[in-house]
Amino acid sequence: MKLKTFITLLFIAASLSVWGQRPKIGLVLGGGGAKGAAEVGVLHEIERAGVHIDYIAGTSIGAIVGGLYSVGYRAADLDTLFRSQNWLTLLSDRDTTHCKKIVREEDGVTYLFGFPVRRTKAVGKKAKGFGLLRGDNVYNFLDSLVANAPIYRQRNTHLQRIPFRCVAFDVRRQNEVILTEDSLARNMRASMAIPGGFKSVSIDSMTLVDGGMINNLPVDIVRAMGAEIVIAVDLTQTKHDDFDAPLSFLRGLGGFIKWLVERPDIVRYNENRKQADVYINPNLKDYGVTSFNPNAIADMIEIGKKAGEAQREALKGVKLKKQAL
C-alpha cells in the first residue's frame, strides 16, 4: 500500500512538473479604433480552437478588448458588448461650455470654438489635457465593466485573472509606458487616448496618450511577460515596409517633429509583426477607426471570425504544442 501511495505521489509530482514546463501562450491585440470589433471575431475562433491564453498585451482598442478579456469577459460577452453599444453617445462627451466664445483661455489651454488648439505654461494650476473629447463616458463605462467583471462574481470562481499589460505614450518624455492590471479602467483609457481626439491621462508626472504612437502591436511586451508562443491580431492595413525616415535631417528639432521624422511606431511595428508565431491580419480595408455604426461593427466581427478561421490549423497547432510537453 505504501509503495502504491508513493508511486501515485511521484506521478502527481511529475505531472505538475510537466504542466509547469508547458509553453506559455501570449495574445497580442493591436490598435485600430472601431476595427477592434474584428479582434472579438478572432477571439471566437481562438476559443473554438481550445487555446488557453496565459498572457495578454494590447494597445488602444486592443487594450480595451484585452483588458476586459483578462478579467473574465469572453468572446460572446464582448460580441454582445460591441453590438449593443451606442458608440456615438459613448464617445461624444465634448465639453461644449467652451463654445460660448470664439477664443477662450482656461487653465493654460487656448480654445478655438471650444476645441483646444494651444497650451500655454500653466502657473499655479493643473493644466488640462488636449483632446476634443473628455473621455469621461468611456472611462465610466470601462470602470463599470471592470467592477462587475466575471472574475469577481461568486459563481465564476473557476476564472482566473490573466496577466495583462497595455501600452501608452508619454508625450512629455516621448517614451513608451507599460501599464499593468492596477487601475485597469484608467490604464485602458490612457492607452486609447488618441492625441487631439481624447483628453490625455495624467499619471504621476506623465501625460499619457494612445500607445499606438510608439507600439501598436506589442509582441515584444508579451514576450517579456513570459510568453513563448505569441498569437498577434493586427488591425493595420498599410504596412510601410520600406520606411526609411526620409526627413531624418529634421530630427534635431526634437519633440513631436522628431517623432514625426523617425516614426518609431512604424519601426517597432515592423519588428514586432515578424516575431509573432501566429499572425492574424483581418482584411479591414473598407473600414476605418471611426466605423462604429452597427452594420460595420457586425461586419467586422464576422471578418475577424473568418480571419481566425483561416488560421484554425495554426491555432490548433498552438494547442497541441501546449499539450505535447
Provide a role label for each language-model segment.
Residues 1-7:
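Bacterial N-terminal signal peptides that target proteins for export
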Residues 10-19:
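Hydrophobic h-region of N-terminal signal peptides that target proteins for export
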Residues 19-59, 67-325:
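Patatin-like phospholipase
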